[in-house]
């Protein structure tokens, strides 16, 4: 079996070289405030002409992910041909470091070379995923170090700042890429340092291994602050050496300093890794972004870090979990601001939710245009994802590949403060930011732009170019400066459409979503319509507004892209049209909005409106099948995943079928909740004041608080119900005011019953919600 060896002598980063690397990046940290900042204008530059040109001509990634091989056998030409026949041009394969490099410095490329040859013969390119850890076979067995969490627990990855093992990974990647970069079956490489695609996510928050703390003391602190006196001045301390500065865990004094170091570590390491790969290959490169916006403080997955490096080294960013509109919108805005290609991938849910989530993920692709870099299906592995999700994805590929133009971004910003992730304790919370972006967009179907504090700080974006700014998680210094310079700062999402008009009106926003692509000449548009609710169908109309689509003024009509025929429609005064639409769950459609009135003979419905309607009372009860037939579903019934705060089990107590919440001992998390979703087409879902009636098993010491999506808080505290006695079925009715049910809570919920004592179960028999007029 042939082997390829590294050149003699391991290139471990010595002390001085490592210190120089920190010095080179020290301007990324602000020693004056103990709050690391993202890249400055200088460090955000696109680098040399050679670097900027690398990979620029790479085609879009239309791909599915595969295991490294087919149960020990190389993927065959026939298997790759079957993938190509579905409209894909690439496959991502999960690389097992230990198989490729079974011992330090000794490589076995036999199977990889065979697969590359087979792929090339089928017209497919292979994109290796270079996991450092977290996937089978990575890290290699001869890598022995282990990361440590902030609580002292064992992590998954090697210690981030074990320089010898870090260099081992760098050498594994660069040696492999150098070997395959000119192979016709090679389609680029995905770089992933840390745990999978979520950096510091090591059974919690990694970064407290001895090697990490040593690097913090010996390199980062001296290069950032230069002297202990400057550190003391910035942080109000009285240390006599850097070794005395604690590697503070979250919640402890000086935690922000260590958080700065962790975030800088991601930026520095990915930068050096990418530069090393660019020295051996000009082929396509990719970064995976795993997790969600709320994970940035713990995981270190700051979006702007990856986009800054992607701009410098011509890397495509792949956003995982792109089924989230809030995440896809944010990354689409960033991709367009940084001029970086954006590919999208989903994280598949449980089978019942999979069809609706698949069409949601697919329809979100247009949010990244004109910077769209393709799609990847996770994962073609013979499981239910292949049976349910894969056919939906492959059937939609021709539609996605035919989208031409741009998402119609308006000069209105939804602003997200990310400074908390850099260690600023006063920064805005990111916990609900992504869901709130989703709720804003779903409610108003408006082409606002998402802007991050990092974009403004590194001068990629200037807030002055926006007609209005809506701060999502607090007004920081950037927003204050914008307002002082005459900018308009909004205080509520309902004000968005005054500055960024809706491109469509919907009957029920959280059952249907519409993602537009406007042609470059602004005289036509493509609309991808997705029925995204796994339970509740859409029944109503869609009103199209040319101004929101950024079309030139005039008359337009809607055409079914599949048939080329004009849809039944009623002309609107603004030049758009109202199109009746009734569609089942988890369906996709494409419309074209074209200039001119509808052709003669096009049916004109007698009426067409998105006006409110629907049920004024909705309910659900344990034992009714939880199918939403009465307008409410309990979320996560039968779920068994650890770490979830909303799992429910079907049980029986007091002679009644009931839902039982998991205790904190079962779930491993301290809160316990019962999450509820309302039929978005009901009058209840649109009501501002709602009466909630709950039948529950009453015992002393147990109860619940109704927390609901409101105009100001997705988890607004409503009334608390307190149990009594030793156990009996009781019914309580409370009133929820200022409601705005936008599915902004976890798992797209509208409200939850927060358990008073999560160490004990709460039993629920039924819920009913009625408009206040009832």
Feature names for model-found ranges:
Residues 281-436, 497-509, 568-571:
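Hydrophobic targeting/anchoring helices
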Residues 493, 499-518, 603-681:
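Glycan-recognition and processing domains
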Residues 473, 490-491, 573-609, 735-738, ...:
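C-terminal beta-strand-rich structural cap/linker in extracellular carbohydrate-active enzymes
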Residues 409-446, 452-453, 460-480, 504-552, ...:
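Carbohydrate-binding surface patches
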Residues 713-745:
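Extracellular carbohydrate recognition and processing domains
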Residues 76-153, 168, 173-177, 273-278:
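Aromatic-lined substrate-binding rim segments of carbohydrate-active enzymes
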Residues 751-760:
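Short beta-strand-plus-loop segments that form exposed binding edges in beta-rich domains
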């Amino acid at each position: 079996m042939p082997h390829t060896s590294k050149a003699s002598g391991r290139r471990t980063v010595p002390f001085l070289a490592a210190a120089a690397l920190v010095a080179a990046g020290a301007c990324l940290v602000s020693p004056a405030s103990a709050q690391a900042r993202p890249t400055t204008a200088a460090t955000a530059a696109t680098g040399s002409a050679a670097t900027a040109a690398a990979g620029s001509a790479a085609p879009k990634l239309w791909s599915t992910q595969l295991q490294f091989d087919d149960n020990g056998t190389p993927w065959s030409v026939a298997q790759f041909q079957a993938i190509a026949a579905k409209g894909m041009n690439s496959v991502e394969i999960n690389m097992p470091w230990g198989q490729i490099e079974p011992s330090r410095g000794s490589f076995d490329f036999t199977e990889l070379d065979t697969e590359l040859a087979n792929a090339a013969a089928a017209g497919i390119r292979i994109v290796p995923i270079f996991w450092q850890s977290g996937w089978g076979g990575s890290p290699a067995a001869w890598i022995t170090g282990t990361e440590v969490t902030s609580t002292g627990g064992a992590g998954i990855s090697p210690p981030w700042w074990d320089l010898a093992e870090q260099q081992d990974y760098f050498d594994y990647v660069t040696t492999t890429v150098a070997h395959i970069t000119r192979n016709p079956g090679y389609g680029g490489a995905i770089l992933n340092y840390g745990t999978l695609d979520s950096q510091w996510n090591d059974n919690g928050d990694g970064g407290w291994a001895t090697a990490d703390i040593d690097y913090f003391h010996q390199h980062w602190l001296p290069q950032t602050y230069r002297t202990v006196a400057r550190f003391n001045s910035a942080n109000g301390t009285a240390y006599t050496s850097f070794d005395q500065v604690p590697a503070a865990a979250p919640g402890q004094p000086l935690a922000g300093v260590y958080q700065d170091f962790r975030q800088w570590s991601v930026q520095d390491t990915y930068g050096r890794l990418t530069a090393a790969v660019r020295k051996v290959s000009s082929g396509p490169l990719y970064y995976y972004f795993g997790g969600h916006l709320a994970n940035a403080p713990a995981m270190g997955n700051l979006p702007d870090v990856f986009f800054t490096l992607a701009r410098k080294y011509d890397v495509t960013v792949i956003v995982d979990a792109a089924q989230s509109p809030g995440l896809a919108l944010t990354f689409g805005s960033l991709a367009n601001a940084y001029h970086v290609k954006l590919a999208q991938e989903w994280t598949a849910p449980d089978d019942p939710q999979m069809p609706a989530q698949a069409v949601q993920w697919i329809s979100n692709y247009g949010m990244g245009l004109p910077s769209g870099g393709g799609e990847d299906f996770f994962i073609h592995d013979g499981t239910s994802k292949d049976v349910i999700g894969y056919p939906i994805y492959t059937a939609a590929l021709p539609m996605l590949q035919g989208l031409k133009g741009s998402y119609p971004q308006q000069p209105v910003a939804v602003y997200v403060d990310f400074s908390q992730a850099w260690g600023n304790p006063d920064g805005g919370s990111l916990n609900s930011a992504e869901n709130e972006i989703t709720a804003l967009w779903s409610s108003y179907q408006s082409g606002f732009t998402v802007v991050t504090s990092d974009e403004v700080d590194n001068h990629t974006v200037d807030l002055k170019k926006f007609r209005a700014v809506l701060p999502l998680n607090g007004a920081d210094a950037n927003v204050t400066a914008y307002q002082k310079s005459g900018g308009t700062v909004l205080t509520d999402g309902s004000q968005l459409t005054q500055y960024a008009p809706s491109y469509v009106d919907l009957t029920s926003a959280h059952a249907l979503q519409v993602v537009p692509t406007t042609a470059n000449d602004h005289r036509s548009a493509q609309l991808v319509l997705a029925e995204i609710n796994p339970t509740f169908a859409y029944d109503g109309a869609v009103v199209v507004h040319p101004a929101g689509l950024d079309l030139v003024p005039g008359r337009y009509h809607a055409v079914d892209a599949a048939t080329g025929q004009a849809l039944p429609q009623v002309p609107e005064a603004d030049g758009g049209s109202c199109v009746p639409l009734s569609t089942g769950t988890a369906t996709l459609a494409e419309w074209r909005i074209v200039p001119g009135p509808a052709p003669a003979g096009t049916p004109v419905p007698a009426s067409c409106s998105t006006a409110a309607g629907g049920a004024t009372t909705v309910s659900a009860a344990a034992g009714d099948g939880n199918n939403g037939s009465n307008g409410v579903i309990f979320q996560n019934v039968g779920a068994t995943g650890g770490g979830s705060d909303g799992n429910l089990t079907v049980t029986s107590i007091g002679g009644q079928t009931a839902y039982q919440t998991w205790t904190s001992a079962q779930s491993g998390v301290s809160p316990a909740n019962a999450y509820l979703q309302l039929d978005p087409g009901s009058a209840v879902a649109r009501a501002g004041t709602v009466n909630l009636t709950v039948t529950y098993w009453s015992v002393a010491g147990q109860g619940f608080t109704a927390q609901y999506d409101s105009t100001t808080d997705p988890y607004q505290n409503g009334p608390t119900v307190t149990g009594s006695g030793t156990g009996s079925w009781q019914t309580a009715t409370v009133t929820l005011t200022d409601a705005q049910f936008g599915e902004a809570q976890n798992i797209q919920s509208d409200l939850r019953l927060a358990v008073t004592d999560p160490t004990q179960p709460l039993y629920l028999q039924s819920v009913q919600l009625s408009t206040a007029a009832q």
